């Protein structure tokens, strides 16, 4: 559009307003001018860049401060690597009287330096820093490059079309893969290729017109002809609309990702209307283009940060291991400075807990009681006690986020080793050799709840009070986990396969913490058994304690029906119906009178809205207040005879005295089923095969 009308005051209002240049200093061609639209855009980009840099710096400071607060003397001040930190005492000594240095606590054991945390190496941090620098360069270019030079349109096209990368690359961080470097790299390459194509075609189109800028005319920032601009904005609008529609039907983007899509859709919609009006030679076209460009530039930084996360979410590269770093102080205070050490490549051990470490040659192994992709579970005798040893092949822990494979193993060990409750599976020790990692737990003779419901459900039918005992035991264990401080520990895979029973079937314990996490801000991964997943988890929303409550409701339903929640449906179909059609498995008819209150509790637990579900504190109070008065329950015969245990060990040349397990009152349970996180975020079942 010809802008010469500005000088003779024959433009329409919008054209005049957004093409007008206000002289700030000087005269003639050397005067410093302020263009209403372009310079406002430049200031907007600079504002967005400064905002992002400020929030990044604030996040880094927050990380430094929180690290020093956790590891310093409680005063929040930073300390040098040689300073002595206080752990559960004021004199900097642990309970064993061993001084612990900050260097030992963080750098040596976890490879994380307080001065150079992993946040700096995370893809998300690099992306945000890249966008802020790009916006700053674009703003300074528009503000200070002389608009009457031939370099001005070329540089503006090159930098301006870079929004193809900055606008779309962010979407890779919004679909639940966290710091997935492969996905980020792939998306960056795709966006860069598209950027090069559009940038080259735009430059060719501009220079083919042989149009030279006169005075400040190039500062209108309209180097594309109206038809090209309309085509690009309409195409972008259609693509973003399709993607948004796909996220509504199948939520592969986090809810915050839709905010960014709506922002891009709004900008392209207004810009396309402006381009269309310019084609029709309507003055209002410049109003649409100018308003869209200015709002876009000023809101870009704040909205990008709001979409991707807040200060705490910037720690997402370390977020999965924050419980380990927090609880590491407790390990060291209990077992001394040298109790945990991480070895280099090729070393014989990846983790050593001095009080928990057990060598494989200390076991007398019996039969395999569970197996799967990640390894196997074997019954064993250790120091006269029957235990379960989960033997894990080290290469089964490789993951896609670039972290060391030992971290996944370390995570479960860390969670297990700090839990102490009668209704949570007891951790006894850890083994680590060149190619094998092992976790030692108490042996549970009753097997899994899943196997009981499959093979011996008649025991529950004959003794209805058993269902109450199991529900109360599980609720106590889950209340203990959810009441963990400072943040609740979410199980995320609560199912009948992960509830283990004693030989009398009167005590149930929560097991398998391979997928557990301390609650954070971005827990959106879809994990666990599909049949037990809460609707909000299936569609990709935040994982909260109420998701475990939903799983508990289905678990109790399984106890009183003896069936799996999906019944004849495929697990994926069951999860889809529960999420989108509010389907729940039917309650048994008629229901045992002793189970009527359990039925009411089930319906409370599996409500669609997480806010309407009770907490485990309420659940436990409800169960204990409504447990029916019944005749004394007579436990069934032991599931596994002592002689069979001894014979299994004899077959492995490990002779045991018959009846030796009679004296093992401390450890009489079996670790029968396991689910560990496999590559890509799925889970692999360990099927109970012990007779």
UniProtKB/Swiss-Prot annotation:
Residues 363-634 form the Protein kinase domain. It is found in: Membrane. It catalyses: L-tyrosyl-[protein] + ATP = O-phospho-L-tyrosyl-[protein] + ADP + H(+). ATP binds at residues 369-377, 390. It is a multi-pass membrane protein. It is an enzyme of class 2 (transferase). GO terms for cellular component: cytoplasm; membrane. It comes from the Eukaryota. Its EC number is 2.7.10.1. Residues 55-126, 177-186, 249-258, 306-691 are cytoplasmic. The active site is at residue 493. GO terms for biological process: signal transduction. The chain crosses the membrane at residues 34-54, 127-144, 154-176, 187-207, 228-248, 259-279, 285-305. Residues 1-33, 145-153, 208-227, 280-284 are extracellular. Keywords: ATP-binding, Kinase, Membrane, Nucleotide-binding, Transferase, Transmembrane, Transmembrane helix, Tyrosine-protein kinase. InterPro entries: Kinase-like_dom_sf (IPR011009), Prot_kinase_dom (IPR000719), Protein_kinase_ATP_BS (IPR017441), Ser-Thr/Tyr_kinase_cat_dom (IPR001245), Ser/Thr_Kinases-Pseudokinases (IPR051681), Tyr_kinase_AS (IPR008266). PANTHER family: SERINE/THREONINE-PROTEIN KINASE TNNI3K-RELATED. Belongs to the protein kinase superfamily. TKL Tyr protein kinase family. This is Seven transmembrane domain-containing tyrosine-protein kinase 1.
């Amino acid at each position: 559009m010809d802008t010469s009308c500005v000088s003779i005051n024959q433009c329409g209002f919008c054209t005049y307003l957004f093409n007008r240049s206000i002289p700030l200093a000087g005269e003639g061609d050397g005067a410093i001018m302020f263009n209403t639209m372009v310079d406002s855009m430049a200031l907007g980009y600079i504002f967005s860049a400064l905002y992002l840099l400020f929030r990044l710096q604030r996040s880094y400071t927050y990380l430094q401060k929180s690290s020093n607060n956790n590891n310093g003397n409680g005063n929040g001040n930073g300390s040098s690597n040689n300073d002595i930190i206080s752990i559960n005492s004021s004199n900097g000594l642990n309970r064993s009287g061993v001084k612990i240095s900050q260097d030992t606590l963080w750098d040596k054991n976890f490879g994380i330096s307080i001065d150079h945390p992993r946040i700096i190496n995370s893809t998300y941090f690099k992306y945000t820093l890249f966008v802020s620098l790009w916006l700053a360069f674009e703003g300074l270019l528009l503000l200070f490059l002389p608009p009457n030079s031939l370099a001005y349109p070329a540089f503006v096209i090159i930098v301006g079309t870079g929004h193809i990368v900055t606008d779309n690359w962010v979407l890779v961080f919004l679909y639940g893969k966290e710091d997935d470097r492969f996905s980020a790299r792939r998306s960056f390459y795709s966006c860069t290729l598209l950027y090069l194509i559009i940038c080259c075609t735009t430059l060719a189109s501009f220079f083919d017109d042989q149009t030279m800028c006169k005075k400040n005319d190039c500062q209108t920032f309209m180097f594309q002809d109206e038809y090209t601009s309309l085509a690009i904005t309409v195409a972008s609008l259609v693509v973003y609309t399709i993607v948004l529609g796909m996220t509504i039907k199948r939520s592969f983007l986090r809810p915050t990702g839709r905010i960014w899509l709506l922002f891009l859709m709004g900008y392209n919609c207004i810009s396309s209307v402006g381009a269309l009006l310019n084609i029709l030679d309507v003055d209002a076209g410049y109003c649409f283009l100018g308003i869209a460009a200015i709002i876009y530039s000023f809101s870009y930084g704040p909205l990008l940060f709001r979409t991707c996360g807040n200060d705490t979410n910037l720690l997402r590269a370390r977020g999965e291991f924050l419980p380990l770093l927090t609880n590491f102080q407790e390990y060291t205070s209990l077992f001394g400075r040298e109790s945990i050490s991480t070895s280099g490549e090729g070393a014989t051990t990846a983790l050593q807990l001095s009080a928990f470490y057990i060598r494989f040659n200390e076991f007398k192994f019996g039969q395999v009681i569970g197996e799967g992709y990640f390894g196997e579970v074997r019954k064993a005798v250790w120091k006269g006690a029957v235990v379960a040893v989960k033997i894990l092949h080290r290469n089964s822990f490789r993951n896609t986020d670039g972290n060391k494979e030992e971290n996944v193993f370390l995570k479960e060990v860390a969670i297990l080793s700090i839990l102490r409750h009668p209704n949570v599976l007891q951790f006894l020790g850890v083994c680590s050799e060149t190619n094998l990692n092992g976790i030692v737990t108490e042996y549970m003779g009753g097997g899994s709840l899943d196997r009981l419901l499959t093979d011996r459900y008649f025991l529950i039918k004959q003794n209805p009070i058993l269902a109450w005992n199991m529900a109360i035991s599980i609720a106590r264990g889950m209340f203990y986990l959810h009441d963990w401080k400072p943040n609740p520990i979410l199980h995320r895979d609560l199912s009948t396969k992960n509830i283990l029973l004693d030989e009398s079937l009167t005590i149930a314990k929560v097991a398998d913490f391979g997928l557990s996490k301390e609650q954070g801000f971005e827990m959106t991964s879809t994990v666990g058994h599909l049949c037990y997943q809460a609707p909000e988890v299936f569609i990709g929303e935040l994982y909260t304690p109420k998701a475990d409550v939903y799983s508990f409701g289905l678990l109790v339903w399984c106890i009183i029906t003896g069936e799996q929640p999906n019944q004849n449906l495929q697990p994926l179909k069951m999860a889809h119906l529960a999420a989108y059609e509010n389907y729940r498995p039917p309650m048994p008819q008629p229901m045992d009178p002793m189970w009527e209150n359990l039925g009411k509790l089930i319906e409370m637990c599996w409500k669609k809205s997480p806010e309407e579900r009770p907490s485990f504190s309420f659940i436990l109070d409800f169960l204990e207040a409504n447990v029916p008065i019944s005749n004394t329950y007579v436990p069934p015969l032991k599931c596994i005879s002592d002689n069979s245990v001894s014979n299994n060990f004899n077959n492995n040349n490990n002779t045991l005295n018959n009846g030796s397990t009679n004296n093992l009152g401390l450890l009489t349970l079996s670790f029968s089923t396991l689910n560990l996180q496999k590559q890509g975020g799925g889970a692999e079942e360990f099927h109970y095969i012990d007779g």
